[in-house]
């Protein structure tokens, strides 16, 4: 159910009761969804519209949030060269860790070999089961992806909710505002004033998060069943463990080097993580993540550039999944890939993960795009993991979210746009207790 406004409900110490916290409500909704989907699968399978409706509500507000954050952030920059530096450093970070994620997935697949011993005849696989994904994969290309960043019309970019197109226009508009100087002050003031109702709307929409998480989880368990995990438990377990180690070890080392704790960051964004877990959509947490990163001391200009771009270029979880799943299919079908074949797979995955970014079902479609170029592994082999992809998509989205949170703090620190004292307070829990739910307009 929709969370009530608990602001007025507090105990004698002035603290809110535990059940008033969004993460508690979402966690309870996820548990309820699992139980309903398991014991009443037919009813659970019919609750998909609840999750879809919530995700659509959030997507409705993503474009205004990105526009206001980026445009006002860049307009307030005294040095426009910073825009290029921030973007360049962000892309360097994305390329480094996205490639590392691909390599880690490949190494783990070779060591654990989750598909070994299955001995599946490739000729027995039904290619029609993945035909839709394969056709979408063939439609993607690097050139097409890059040209598609430029919107045909401004209205079209906002109407379609295309994150990169909205970001592209917002950056140009913010630069134009900064260049006109005093003439643009009234526009900047108007946009800053407009942030209040828009970001208050974000807080209101988040009240519906438990409903969305409940419906999405009930549908997932009701339609696919917990039992469907058992047959491919080795692959699922390997992927979840690899992603967990990537977050705690790799991103943990990056966090430690940059002066903060990955565990403290995970606690800080726990509401966004649970939201992603319940809905299997990282986009559902985008407004909240931008909110949290700005409250954690990252300048708005950095937050507005890094996070939306990272949602297309910094997909650590998706990249781990791509190489791990590709080698699983090869192992399950008895195909022995040489190191040359695997290096080719890695290079193709580096490109296809960018060409298919930002599209619906990106993880599975990107895998199809990669396998269609690598002749050694049959695309039809994707039918083996089609039934469990929904369970793996949650882990992909969670890892992607954490990766973008870490990237934002790191890039902000590189650019000296990070308030380290504010970051320490936020990760220590002080900012979370005092700050409202919506992203705060610039002062």
Curated annotation (Swiss-Prot):
Annotated organism of origin: Rhizobium leguminosarum bv. trifolii (strain WSM2304)
Any Pfam family: SDF
Designated gene of the protein: dctA
InterPro entries reported in the protein's UniProt record: C4_dicarb_transport (IPR023954), Na-dicarboxylate_symporter (IPR001991), Na-dicarboxylate_symporter_CS (IPR018107), Na:dicarbo_symporter_sf (IPR036458)
Taxonomic lineage of the native organism: Bacteria, Pseudomonadati, Pseudomonadota, Alphaproteobacteria, Hyphomicrobiales
GO biological process: L-aspartate transmembrane transport
Descriptive protein name: C4-dicarboxylate transport protein
Protein's membrane topology: Multi-pass membrane protein
Keywords for this protein: Cell inner membrane, Cell membrane, Membrane, Symport, Transmembrane, Transmembrane helix, Transport
Cell location: Cell inner membrane
